[in-house]
Amino acid sequence: MRLDKFLKVSRLIKRRTLAKEVADQGRISINGNQAKASSDVKPGDELTVRFGQKLVTVQVNELKDTTKKEEAANMYTILKEEKLGE
């Protein structure tokens, strides 16, 4: 599954276009490598996303084309959250 689609379906990022912009700015990495919006995501991958002053690392649990809002958080596990610049 494409990175931008995963981020939107899992609701880590609200819109797919925003996920693409964030990836194009170099703020997302997959398993330590900088990722593009079109990069493939697989279960077991570790994603690191920089949201402003926060760095969030998650592990991909499962991939779904669509999901209910209540079940979206089951698609990933948060491994680490850290604040930057403090």
Curated annotation (Swiss-Prot):
Keywords: Protein biosynthesis, RNA-binding, rRNA-binding, tRNA-binding. Changing residue 11 to A: No longer associates with 50S subunit. Synthetic growth defect with ssrA deletion. GO terms for cellular component: RQC complex. SMART domains: S4 (SM00363). Disruption phenotype: Not essential; synthetic growth defects can be seen in double rqcP-ssrA mutants. Double rqcH-rqcP deletion strains grow normally in rich media. Loss of Ala tailing, RqcH is still recruited to the 50S ribosomal subunit. In vivo mild decrease in tRNA(Ala)-binding by RqcH. InterPro entries: RqcP, S4_RNA-bd, S4_RNA-bd_sf. GO terms for biological process: rescue of stalled ribosome. Changing residue 2 to A: Synthetic growth defect with ssrA deletion, no longer associates with 50S ribosomal subunit. One of its GO terms (molecular function) is rRNA binding. Pfam families: S4. Residues 1-62 form the S4 RNA-binding domain. Key component of the ribosome quality control system (RQC), a ribosome-associated complex that mediates the extraction of incompletely synthesized nascent chains from stalled ribosomes and their subsequent degradation. RqcH recruits Ala-charged tRNA, and with RqcP directs the elongation of stalled nascent chains on 50S ribosomal subunits, leading to non-templated C-terminal alanine extensions (Ala tail). The Ala tail promotes nascent chain degradation. RqcP is associated with the translocation-like movement of the peptidyl-tRNA from the A-site into the P-site. Activity of this protein is best tested in a clpP or ssrA deletion mutant; ssrA (tmRNA) encodes the SsrA tag added to nascent proteins in stalled ribosomes by trans-translation, which targets the nascent protein for degradation. Associates with stalled 50S ribosomal subunits. Binds to RqcH, 23S rRNA and the P-site tRNA. Does not require RqcH for association with 50S subunits. Crystallized 50S subunits are variously associated with an A/P-site tRNA with or without RqcH, as well as with P- and E-site tRNAs but no RqcH. Displaced from the 50S subunit by puromycin but not thiostrepton. Belongs to the RqcP family. This is RQC P-site tRNA stabilizing factor. It comes from Bacillus subtilis (strain 168).
